[in-house]
Each structure stands twice: as structure tokens, then as C-alpha cells.
Amino acid sequence: MDYLAKIYITLKPAVNDPQGVTVLGALKNLGFNTPVDVRVGKYLEVSLGAESEEAAENQVDDMCKKLLANMVIEQYRFDLEEVPGH
């Protein structure tokens, strides 16, 4: 089966986010006064083949832990969907 993993990687809540602070300041300078916090992260899409949904989940989890996310300062989550017609 073919799957598409949509991976969201963000800094852990306790980690300072200087990019988020910069974006928040820029939004306020542009007149957007409602945002009170901004956190910047990464979004990735990975297409993969696997024997089952569980196997695909395990592969994506390993990818995140071993390469895609810095487990010291980042956290991740992902959505997995089967790609029809492949």
C-alpha cells in the first residue's frame, strides 16, 4: 500500500522560539494586534510504501526520531492517509 504522511514538527513548549517572536513583532507592526503568540515549525509530506498502516506509522515514527526532528528541542506529530489508486 502507498501512504502519505503529513508531518508537523514544532519546538517544545519550554524552548524559546526567536523566529516566532520576530513574526509576532512583524504582525503587530502591520496592525494585527490580536495574535498573542506565534510558534514557527516545519511541515513535511513524505510518500511511502508499506505492507500495512501500522508498518507505515512505524516507518514515519522512525524517520522523525532519527532524522527529521531534533528530539532534544522539537516535538512532532503526523497524520497518515492511504493514497488511493497506487
Model features per residue range: what roles?
Residues M1-Y43, S47-H86:
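Long, contiguous binding/interaction regions
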